[in-house]
């Protein structure tokens, strides 16, 4: 449901969009849906359901086809909002020798904490007006993202961190890594607006929880499902620890979310 929206979001920011279709079986219908959207996949794979480790492997494989070029890495429900023009950030990287730019999740949720229905005509920014940080407190799922990087820079499972010389670059001790674009007080840290939380998410959380497979990170999904169940099937947007703020302006306005500087400190500590 989010793919048309994510394509539209990035189409003017990048030179090419590489869509990798991950189907569970050759007749699960996902490939037909992609083609009906007018999208020609770069690659189609058939793999077990919810194998997030395989997904990361595919990201790294595709990026390595152009190791010296810059890539934007995004799942179909992740919408980057940059603190300044993306090309300007890349120019900064080229001038200073940085090879990857990091960011963190801002969770988007509907009116009163509900999970809205989405179709290809939905204005997702208006349909999910509340922005905050509830996924990590409820499930301990990592909120860090490695967002933009040279093709040769690999990412960890979940695309949470960059890998340099076999080392995962994470935590406060790597905040000023020489190849990492400095996050600063938010002026170098990309907002990843996460539109995972639509009307289909509860069934997906339940389905992943049932797998009991390590590569699905099922325990995080189980925690999240139980937390939502205990909250009357909504997100309690009144909780201060969720940093909820209602956003009204243009979605490209990075600084509209006024809690970003404070939230950054929590994210980079994970």
Predicted regions and their residues:
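Short, well-formed alpha-helical segments that are part of the catalytic scaffolds
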Residues: 1-13
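Short, hydrophobic/aromatic alpha-helical segments in well-folded domains
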Residues: 5-6, 58, 75, 88-89
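Short, high-confidence coil segments that cap the C-terminus of an alpha-helix
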Residues: 14, 66-68, 95-99
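Catalytic-site signature of metal-activated, phosphate-bearing donor transferases
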Residues: 52-57, 82-270
């Amino acid at each position: 449901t989010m793919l048309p929206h994510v394509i539209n979001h990035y189409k003017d920011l990048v030179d090419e969009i590489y869509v990798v279709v991950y189907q569970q079986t050759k007749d699960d219908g996902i490939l037909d849906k992609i083609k009906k959207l007018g999208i020609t996949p770069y690659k189609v794979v058939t793999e077990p359901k919810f194998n997030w480790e395989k997904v990361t492997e595919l990201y790294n494989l595709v990026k390595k086809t152009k190791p010296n070029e810059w890539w934007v890495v995004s799942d179909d429900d992740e919408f980057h909002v940059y603190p300044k023009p993306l090309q300007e950030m890349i120019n900064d990287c080229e001038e200073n020798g940085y090879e990857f730019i990091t960011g963190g999740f801002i969770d988007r949720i509907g009116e009163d904490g509900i999970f809205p229905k989405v179709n290809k005509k939905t204005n997702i920014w208006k349909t999910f007006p509340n922005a905050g940080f509830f996924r990590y407190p409820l499930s301990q799922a990592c909120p860090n993202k490695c967002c933009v990087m040279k093709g040769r820079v690999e990412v960890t499972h979940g695309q949470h961190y960059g890998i340099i010389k076999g080392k995962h670059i994470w935590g406060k001790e790597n905040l000023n890594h020489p190849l990492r674009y400095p996050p600063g007080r938010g002026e170098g840290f990309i907002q990843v607006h996460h539109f995972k939380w639509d009307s289909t998410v509860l069934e997906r959380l339940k389905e992943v929880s049932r797998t009991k497979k390590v590569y699905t990170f099922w325990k995080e999904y189980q925690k999240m499902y139980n937390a939502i169940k205990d909250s009357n099937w909504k997100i309690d947007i009144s909780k201060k620890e969720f940093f909820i703020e209602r956003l009204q302006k243009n979605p490209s306005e990075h600084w509209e979310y006024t809690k970003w500087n404070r939230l950054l400190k929590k994210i980079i500590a994970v």
